[in-house]
Amino acid sequence: MFSKLAYSVFEQSIKDYHQFDNVDQPINNPYTKEQFEHLLYLKNWIDTVQWHFEDIIRDPNIDPVAALTLKRRIDASNQERTDMVEYIDSYFLQKYSHVKVKEEAKINSESPAWAFDRLSILALKIYHMSEEAHRAEASQEHRDKCQEKLNILLEQRTDLFTAIDDLLTDIENGDKFMKVYKQMKMYNDDELNPVLYHGKK
């Protein structure tokens, strides 16, 4: 199952990040650029670093100047995340370019790469909820509540595995077709963000 392969790469990325747990640590992607897993690993690494950016910026004692700098790093990370999704969709467009789409084929509400994006974020939720469910210094009540949440996340993972694999099978069989829209991020574009383009005057 393609979804489980992707998830195993996401888990590896998360595990590798937490060896040092530092948002500034360099990535050491174990896959070559020719492998699809390289994109998956990089995608999740970006997600994992951003997850920890979001933790840091919520510190009530954060220095305002540091918070502004971090907010800009988060914006840049969001753009990277979107770019990676588009790279992954490009892979699938190429992979299924030979498929003869059936006349009655339908379009899906999201592309394969955005489904994998959700799976990547879900892997992070599961990792951190599992940490909380097993945190020794936490109260039993806290651990029990986190275990209940973890069980729901694991059920969601099973459902998402099925949904992703069904989608890929449908595309491969011509029952569904891919249509990818380049994400029109506006806040980083000085031609589209009013604050930025007014500032240029």
Label every PLM stretch briefly.
Residues 1-201:
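Anionic, Ser/Thr-rich low-complexity intrinsically disordered regions
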